[in-house]
From Swiss-Prot:
Site (Stabilizes the basic form of H active site to accept a proton): 94
Subcellular location: Cytoplasm
Main subcellular localisation: cytoplasm
Entry's Gene Ontology BP terms: protein quality control for misfolded or incompletely synthesized proteins; rescue of stalled ribosome
Protein name: Peptidyl-tRNA hydrolase
Length: 189
């Protein structure tokens, strides 16, 4: 029987300057997820990639290392190279349309102006992948969006990040379990 292959993608911007920005919450969550496993990243100039294999499930953990708006190149490359279909991809990203701390797992949909998602949709040629949307709040005017997502969390928000990361991890574990159950379901012939 074939293994189920899943791709978990945390998107953000590379480098210490951006490490704790709102835009990098995808990296923070993916790193926490990987820390709870025995795997570690292998890094090249384009991405950091880790892999776990257990109970018939291969999970790839991907952090694209080009800027956010070029995230799709690494996602498409890893998906294609490993035969991973879009419905087995989960992208973890910041969401300005949600108040801080709101989390939502969603399949498909538009990019809502998020340049990282826009590029992933473009490079995969579809929007049918899953997303874990992490609410980071919204600035008062649209012209402030870029500065806002590239700013660090407020101290009172930073305090809540560890708990919200744990909730995010549970949502990811649940998604992996659902994908596994779907994969193992006998097909109707």
């Amino acid at each position: 029987m074939a293994n189920l292959k899943l791709l978990l993608v945390g998107i953000g911007n590379p480098g210490p300057k951006y490490a704790y920005n709102r835009h990098n919450i995808g990296f923070v969550i993916l790193d926490s997820l990987l820390n709870s496993s025995s795997a570690s990243y292998q890094t090249n100039s384009k991405y950091s990639l880790a892999r776990t294999d257990e109970e018939g499930v291969t999970i790839f953990y991907l952090k694209p290392l080009e800027f956010m708006n070029l995230s799709g190149k690494a996602v498409a490359e890893i998906a294609k190279k490993n035969g991973i279909s879009p419905e087995n991809i989960l992208v973890i990203h910041d969401e300005i349309d949600f108040e801080f701390g709101k989390l939502k797992l969603k399949e498909g949909g538009g990019h809502a102006g998020h340049n990282g998602l826009r590029n992933i949709v473009e490079k995969l040629g579809t929007n049918t992948f899953f997303r874990l949307r992490f609410g980071v709040g919204k600035p008062s005017t649209a012209s402030e969006v870029s500065d806002y997502v590239l700013s660090n969390f407020f101290p009172e928000e930073k305090e809540k990040i560890p708990e919200l990361v744990q909730v995010s991890l549970q949502k990811i574990y649940d998604w992996v379990r659902e994908r596994k159950n779907e994969f193992q379901k006998p097909s109707d012939i």
